[in-house]
C-alpha cells in the first residue's frame, strides 16, 4: 500500500514538473529586409511587410569569438557552440519552439550560411532569453539577395 501511494505521488509530482515547464520558449516571425533602412528627419524607415519562409537555428549563447565570420558581413560559415534546435517557419514566416529556460542565440539560415545582425554589449550574437512559463516574442530578419540594404 505504501509503495502504491509513493508511486502515485511520484507520478503526480513528475506530471506537475512537466506541465509547469511545457509552454515556454520562443515564437515570432521572420521578415525579409531590403531597401532604405536609414533614419531621416522627415521619413520613417520602410518596415518589413510580410513574413518569409526561413530556417531558424537556436544555439547555446554564442559570442562573436565562437563563429567563423564571412568578412565584415553578419553572415557566419560555422558556429562553434552546440545547436539546440532547428525549425522551418510556415509560409508567412511564423515559428514557435518550446525550449528550456536559458539564454540562447538565434540565427536564420541562408544556404550554408547563418545570419544574425544583432549583438549585445558582450558581443553575444542575437541573444534571446527564455523565462519559465513564458513564450519570448522574437522578430528575425534575412537580407534579400535583390534589394540593397542601407
Model-predicted regions and their roles:
Residues 66-92:
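Short, acidic Ser/Thr/Gly-rich low-complexity loop/linker segments typical of extracellular
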Residues 100-108:
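A short tyrosine-centered beta-strand micro-motif
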Amino acid at each position: 500500500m505504501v509503495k502504491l501511494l509513493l508511486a502515485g505521488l511520484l507520478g503526480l509530482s513528475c506530471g506537475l514538473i512537466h506541465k509547469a515547464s511545457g509552454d515556454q520558449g520562443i515564437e515570432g516571425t521572420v521578415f525579409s529586409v531590403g531597401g532604405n533602412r536609414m533614419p531621416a528627419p522627415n521619413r520613417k524607415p520602410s518596415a518589413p511587410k510580410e513574413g518569409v519562409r526561413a530556417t531558424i537555428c537556436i544555439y547555446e549563447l554564442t559570442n562573436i569569438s565562437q563563429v567563423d565570420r564571412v568578412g565584415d558581413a553578419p553572415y557566419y560559415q560555422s558556429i562553434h557552440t552546440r545547436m539546440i534546435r532547428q525549425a522551418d517557419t510556415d509560409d508567412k514566416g511564423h515559428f514557435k519552439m518550446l525550449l528550456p529556460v536559458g539564454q540562447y542565440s538565434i540565427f536564420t539560415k541562408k544556404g550554408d550560411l547563418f545570419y544574425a545582425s544583432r549583438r549585445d554589449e558582450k558581443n553575444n550574437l542575437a541573444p534571446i532569453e527564455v523565462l519559465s512559463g513564458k513564450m519570448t516574442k522574437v522578430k528575425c530578419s534575412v537580407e534579400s539577395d535583390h534589394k540593397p540594404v542601407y
